[in-house]
Amino acid sequence: MSQPMTVQCPTCDTPVEWSAASPSRPFCSERCKLIDLGAWASEEHAIPVSPDAEDEMFSGDLEAPHRGH
């Protein structure tokens, strides 16, 4: 039988078996899962986006309102 795959907990680096026996995977525990969620909620973690892409994404939202005079 092969060894089960293990991954490192993203919060504390503890080895975690990737199986149904580890319901919080990839985290080692519910505590580490909540610590990570809190970091995303407080914007300690972010997905990098180039400033140009962000400007392009929201440029349509900033159009001046049409005035019918």
Curated annotation (Swiss-Prot):
| UniProt keyword annotations, A-Z | Metal-binding, Zinc
Task: Tell me the GO molecular function terms.
Answer: DNA topoisomerase type II (double strand cut, ATP-hydrolyzing) inhibitor activity; zinc ion binding
Q: Give the source's domain of life in one word.
A: Bacteria
Q: Is Acetylation among the key words of this record?
A: no
User: Which residues participate in Zn(2+) binding?
Assistant: 9, 12, 28, 32
Region (Disordered) location? 47-69
Kindly list the cofactors needed.
Zn(2+)
| GO biological process, alphabetically ordered | regulation of DNA-templated transcription
Disulphide bridges, residue numbers: none
What does the Swiss-Prot or TrEMBL cofactor note state?
Binds 1 zinc ion.
Q: Which family does it belong to?
A: Belongs to the DNA gyrase inhibitor YacG family.
Fetch the HAMAP family from UniProt.
DNA_gyrase_inhibitor_YacG (MF_00649)
What does this chain do?
Inhibits all the catalytic activities of DNA gyrase by preventing its interaction with DNA. Acts by binding directly to the C-terminal domain of GyrB, which probably disrupts DNA binding by the gyrase.
How does it associate, per the subunit comment?
Answer: Interacts with GyrB.
Could you identify this protein by its name? DNA gyrase inhibitor YacG
